[in-house]
Amino acid sequence: MAAAAAAAVGGQQPSQPELPAPGLALDKAATAAHLKAALSRPDNRAGAEELQALLERVLSAERPLAAAAGGEDAAAAGGGGGPGAAEEEALEWCKCLLAGGGGYDEFCAAVRAYDPAALCGLVWTANFVAYRCRTCGISPCMSLCAECFHQGDHTGHDFNMFRSQAGGACDCGDSNVMRESGFCKRHQIKSSSNIPCVPKDLLMMSEFVLPRFIFCLIQYLREGYNEPAADGPSEKDLNKVLQLLEPQISFLEDLTKMGGAMRSVLTQVLTNQQNYKDLTSGLGENACVKKSHEKYLIALKSSGLTYPEDKLVYGVQEPSAGTSSLAVQGFIGATGTLGQVDSSDEDDQDGSQGLGKRKRVKLSSGTKDQSIMDVLKHKSFLEELLFWTIKYEFPQKMVTFLLNMLPDQEYKVAFTKTFVQHYAFIMKTLKKSHESDTMSNRIVHISVQLFSNEELARQVTEECQLLDIMVTVLLYMMESCLIKSELQDEENSLHVVVNCGEALLKNNTYWPLVSDFINILSHQSVAKRFLEDHGLLVTWMNFVSFFQGMNLNKRELNEHVEFESQTYYAAFAAELEACAQPMWGLLSHCKVRETQEYTRNVVRYCLEALQDWFDAINFVDEPAPNQVTFHLPLHRYYAMFLSKAVKCQELDLDSVLPDQEMLMKLMIHPLQIQASLAEIHSNMWVRNGLQIKGQAMTYVQSHFCNSMIDPDIYLLQVCASRLDPDYFISSVFERFKVVDLLTMASQHQNTVLDAEHERSMLEGALTFLVILLSLRLHLGMSDDEILRAEMVAQLCMNDRTHSSLLDLIPENPNPKSGIIPGSYSFESVLSAVADFKAPVFEPGGSMQQGMYTPKAEVWDQEFDPVMVILRTVYRRDVQSAMDRYTAFLKQSGKFPGNPWPPYKKRTSLHPSYKGLMRLLHCKTLHIVLFTLLYKILMDHQNLSEHVLCMVLYLIELGLENSAEEESDEEASVGGPERCHDSWFPGSNLVSNMRHFINYVRVRVPETAPEVKRDSPASTSSDNLGSLQNSGTAQVFSLVAERRKKFQEIINRSSSEANQVVRPKTSSKWSAPGSAPQLTTAILEIKESILSLLIKLHHKLSGKQNSYYPPWLDDIEILIQPEIPKYSHGDGITAVERILLKAASQSRMNKRIIEEICRKVTPPVPPKKVTAAEKKTLDKEERRQKARERQQKLLAEFASRQKSFMETAMDVDSPENDIPMEITTAEPQVSEAVYDCVICGQSGPSSEDRPTGLVVLLQASSVLGQCRDNVEPKKLPISEEEQIYPWDTCAAVHDVRLSLLQRYFKDSSCLLAVSIGWEGGVYVQTCGHTLHIDCHKSYMESLRNDQVLQGFSVDKGEFTCPLCRQFANSVLPCYPGSNVENNPWQRPSNKSIQDLIKEVEELQGRPGAFPSETNLSKEMESVMKDIKNTTQKKYRDYSKTPGSPDNDFLFMYSVARTNLELELIHRGGNLCSGGASTAGKRSCLNQLFHVLALHMRLYSIDSEYNPWRKLTQLEEMNPQLGYEEQQPEVPILYHDVTSLLLIQILMMPQPLRKDHFTCIVKVLFTLLYTQALAALSVKCSEEDRSAWKHAGALKKSTCDAEKSYEVLLSFVISELFKGKLYHEEGTQECAMVNPIAWSPESMEKCLQDFCLPFLRITSLLQHHLFGEDLPSCQEEEEFSVLASCLGLLPTFYQTEHPFISASCLDWPVPAFDIITQWCFEIKSFTERHAEQGKALLIQESKWKLPHLLQLPENYNTIFQYYHRKTCSVCTKVPKDPAVCLVCGTFVCLKGLCCKQQSYCECVLHSQNCGAGTGIFLLINASVIIIIRGHRFCLWGSVYLDAHGEEDRDLRRGKPLYICKERYKVLEQQWISHTFDHINKRWGPHYNGL
């Protein structure tokens, strides 16, 4: 195949090719068919030439690219159609030729049929949603596209969804990367076997055409590239070229999608070297090709690359066998030799930008391996295509094309080799790039596909020197930013380190290369080669040494540092990524004994590098003062490989350890870090700014600790186990600068430390020793034990969520390590140590996540304070752990007081490290412990409980780890006399404890109290002699001792002896000049450690002789010292535990303890009170008095606040609470009294100084969401499911009003209904009152307050001054009586007729607006507020704009909205009765006054007042009918509840109870008639005639007016007169309920119709007259409410079944008034029977509103909505969201849907919820609430298996609905409490 193509392409072309005839040219298909036929012949030479000629002409690169390069003149140059036309033409030709004359689509389909789809290979770009299954993955980078994932079976697997950061490709079907069990259905079958062979002629044309096409593309790329000018590459120009090439590259991409057959043709074309050579060499006559070749050479040269003319250069093409090609050439000396300082570095583009302060250093030695860095020779299209891809900085389209080809195995290998060949060039381009982030992502997008495959990585390692190339490229990259190290010896240092301020490090530019390196090291075969290759190891250690000592900190001693550098981020990231992670990768392959050699290699080169480093920094024996670097990667490599060698490979530790001198050097810098940590925490580095604290915290933080502090501590443990213990201990105290403090004298002088820092530095030193001696992470703990200890430590600090635990537990950074998140061991350990606390919703509104908390037995046995201290980033966490421990002990009754940290037994030491315990048994430590115990007992300054705690801990550690029991013969009497060399006779702590020390000589300032004392008379010369020899000039000269040891060791190596000099720096440490002279004093001590401990027991317990040896009562206790009694407790317990252990280990100790206890301690004389103490006592007294005063004040304040508390406790749920009284009136006072929460005065509200209620007005559409179905609607999760809002309460009321407005007079329609179902105004209060003038000044002060508030004062918003509840208005309280004591309430005995007349008369009186008072002004302003709360469209329903009827309708509808909402808050009925908090905290009474006052300004003309129609018979004129244009709305079509509100609000306030009852009675008659009419319409023709006759017979009975049968029969016969029933067709009957109507079902139907009215009326009565609501069963609700409203006659007998008709009380004869009402309908139904019927049936049975029902699994929502397109722009929105009220899909922040500066969510919240919107953000799983101009994040209702939210789907674990949370969300929506419960609101500026 390839040969044929080559023949066609190659050879000298005739200079004037024969072009096809013009006719053929026009008909592309015919030409293509002709050529295909010609080429199919055995002799296809002519055909081939003809095709070539055609392609020459069609694919000539000259035309379009003149345009591309020409920029502005593009249009002119491109000829007629511009560049686009020519290119389109060329593409059309190509498609035709490929198809060989057939249709291109058919051709594509034909090729697809031959696709052996064994691999998916789908390529995606950044932000694509993919899946990763750790159960199925072999490589940690494995990923699957959504389709393959869902079609495979991953149930129960450890998978997660993720958003791709850099792009990726689907690995389904690739068994190198994942297990076959995880393949999806499509890729499971190895289907290649049943795919037929590709017919030769199908792809024949492709083989001829594609080489030319690709060459043409390459020519475009050559032409279009212009070397960027000096000012940096002009990405604009490059992008322009790429845009022009978009169609061509897309065409290639489409070809790859045709499947395997086409991919293999493309592979042949791309990798065929002959094709490439013939077409691109530029040797032919074609001028265009020549020019293009020149441009290519220029581009190569400008890239700093040489083009070897076919010579084999440096053996790149043929790698030599054996060691790597770089061997050890120039690398070893690299650190040592520094070249000249070169500022004109080719790569130095930002050298001028602020980095000039520190000169860059260039290494002079030949670190560059020319062959790797500078040579590129392209031999195929693929190679040159990749070159241009890199040159153009990895355009997305090109990357996708190159990756789409990867399923072809041959291509994959070729491409990987090409990629490796270009690796150095990639690095250079990356360094220069201005878009390094994007470029990095694209590089990794490619490399992760290549290097994750172990087989492929191994192949390129062997054939292309992959490791050499990577290491060299990394080294070369870092060389460009080296500076001279200032560590230790600034002037003479020869060491170079990376400069962390350089862009390369600051922007993490190196990460793609490092990440590739880590990726290939994860393959065993590759890592093995690396560990075997000495040259590579040397180079790598060289690379690591660039980071050794970087980011050096120098302590500021005088001024605060001017500029806080943030370079430490870069430094920590670099060490972790570039040094530690490759280290973990290598370690993971050193797990077994067989790999010992690898470890030896690494350790060897590591030590060499360390030795070079010590030489380069000129290190002798002392670290330079006031310097610290946290970066010692060489030390850490060494430590980690040592640890691995002992733990896994059974290597003998000593065989890999250096000599003593090297060990001494090795410990210096890690120890310096530990001391610096203590200094930083002691605030000694405070002048260096916050960043130094940041470094100290990062060093121990969970992602870094096991690569930093853990290896450091381990290395120190190793050094301590092998060095002289006295030397080590003294080094520690010297490093921590507390040597001077360790004196028996009460005063001392510290030359290196300020007094204020001494205590914390001493604590630091002791804590460090405790950690060093207790920690077993690398000294023998198994992985599971480590995991358990880590987990316990984290859980003890705080309860943790599962994800934060995963994050906090130091994970082996290498992804292939054993313990991975979610792994079996993690989960099993977690369930063993912790209990799960399910997520709860707390009353304050804060949502808890699912948490893990330590089990009781963990607190009891496993709490390890040492581990906690090691792992805390913040010091407060240690305290938190102790507080929780204390709480546990109190709760479980184990210890009541304040406990000390418990002593925890340690796992046994690995034998290799036994030497570590010598530290506990060395005299130096014993002297320190003795001294500190003595000082604590003597109350010397700067000692704390913490110091004592650590001292006791060390003693106990020593006892636990003491040598075998000492022999009793060991003489212990007369010890002091014989012991001349030191304080203590031996080194065993057990025996040293009982050793008495009599005298000590100390150096003290002359002012010290000790100096005055005479020396003891009894001192014998012998004793003095012993003192002089005992080296106690000051306690013991730690420093001198250390110096001596170091000197000895150094003198051994005589060659260096002459270099040993005291470091120059020591002069800085001389004591301040003003220091008082020191003098020697001798102290009488006469104590042993045991005696000090016993005295300490007395001191701690505050009692003399408090210690009684427990074994005197129970000798058993000595054999079994582990007694639970001693495991928890305070200092006293600790001392007792130690004494018991000391006694049980030695009979001598036991005897001495008993002796000491027998000596009765003399009683202590009473203390004299000194002046200072008196001062303290006075202070105490004063404090006590102040406390009492405060208590008194608080009590006063508390009573004031009591009412508030009762309110505040219950914001979200309106039930279950203590009622909250708005007023504080006494029962006998008739006038209501209010407290002002601002000025604190109480009094009535008056016209001049009105009081008001703090209220929040908000528009609400909750009522409109009610449906007649109990089941909430489901959120649509497929295209088929849709939600149509026809059945909502709002829609039904809308339809009804428009229907009325179509046929009846507008002004009358506006009185027949209520509005406010959508956008109604809801008023709520917290119940607090204030003077309105106080409120105004309060608002003024808020306006001037500059603090950022979560509300807008300009919009009238504020928070209640007392309870801080959100509010935006004040509702004036009407002066007058208290509701409960209303004089108008008393019943009168007037007849109903009299009352009806009174009502009419009162309504007729015009309501004069009260005189201009403050109160009336406030009433008016609050009315304005209420109107402005909702949008105009929700309050303007009149056909004539601005009609007063509109205002009238709006006002009584406000009352309706509030009553209806209260009913919903009570659960939709009044069965529970009582005054629920909602009732007590209601402001309906005050609201009614405001509304009534305004409504009485509109008088209804008595002609039109519905009251008349209800209570009087009028003359019926049958001729009237339809004379006037639009009649009034018939009274039977009126909404009775609206009528009720109109009647009541038209009355003068306050209303009399009997008038209220009268109105209710009259309206009930109308309501009942409506119920009967509705019933008659609902039933069938037969039922109607049956009822008509049955009722007619009873009409003459006495109580006919109260019999529903009679009334129903009468209504049917009246309505029959119109055409109401006549229209029923057959389909109507089918719809009718087929139920048989029994008297019970009819009664129920009538009651159900009337109940909503009764409920609202009862609520209204409750608010107006303060009457309590009775509670009842649901079935008796009607009768209870009816009697409560006075509808039932008092003598009504309850034993009969209840009949609703018995509530009727007709003001005029029933049959007459019914006739009158029906007559109004008759004339209307004669013309519009259909509408007439619809208006009679009023749907009144609304169920409670609900949010949409959500699916169980979040993935269901996500998969449907995250790909759903926006209906406006048809693109997939960046932030899709869905409304949980109505299910609308919206674009959050989407500009496509923006209307008049409002984004879609804000707009939707206004249309759907009148300003309240509840949206689920699809890509974040979070709910966002919009309320007016503010918004807040509410949280998530979807939680994972561990009860946690996953905001932004970062973890991508499966999420499940949390029904409790969703219920809470719904409750807050219904109760309108979002504003009160959620605290974090911010303005959205209409941008959501």
Swiss-Prot record:
Coiled-coil annotated spans: 1168-1199
Record family assignment: Belongs to the E3 ubiquitin-protein ligase UBR1-like family.
Organism, scientific name: Homo sapiens
EC code(s) of this entry: 2.3.2.27
InterPro entries found in the cross-reference section: E3_ligase_UBR-like_C, UBR1-like, UBR1-like_winged-helix, Znf_UBR
Source species, domain of life: Eukaryota
Function: E3 ubiquitin-protein ligase which is a component of the N-end rule pathway. Does not bind to proteins bearing specific N-terminal residues that are destabilizing according to the N-end rule, leading to their ubiquitination and subsequent degradation. May play a role in Shh signaling by mediating the ubiquitination of Kif7. May be important for MYH9 function in certain tissues, possibly by regulating the ubiquitination of MYH9 and consequently affecting its interaction with MYO7A.
Gene3D superfamilies reported for this sequence: 2.10.110.30
Pfam families to which the protein is assigned, alphabetical: PRT6_C, UBR1-like_wing, zf-UBR
Comp. bias regions, Polar residues: 1016-1028
Annotated metabolic or biological route of this protein: Protein modification; protein ubiquitination
RING-type zinc finger locations on the chain: 1306-1364
GO biological process, one term: embryo development ending in birth or egg hatching
Zinc finger residue ranges, UBR-type: 118-189
Enzyme class: transferase
Classification via CDD domains: RING-H2_UBR3, UBR-box_UBR3
Location of region: Disordered: 1-24, 339-362, 1008-1028, 1164-1186
Primary site of residence: membrane
Signal peptide positions (record): none
Keyword field: Coiled coil, Membrane, Metal-binding, Phosphoprotein, Transferase, Transmembrane, Transmembrane helix, Ubl conjugation pathway, Zinc, Zinc-finger
Mode of membrane association: Multi-pass membrane protein
Quaternary structure, from the entry: Interacts with UBE2A and UBE2B.
Modification Phosphoserine occurs at: S343, S344, S1199
Keyword Ribonucleoprotein listed: no
Name under which the protein is recorded: E3 ubiquitin-protein ligase UBR3
Bilayer-crossing regions: 761-781, 919-939, 1806-1826
Biased composition (Basic and acidic residues): 1170-1186
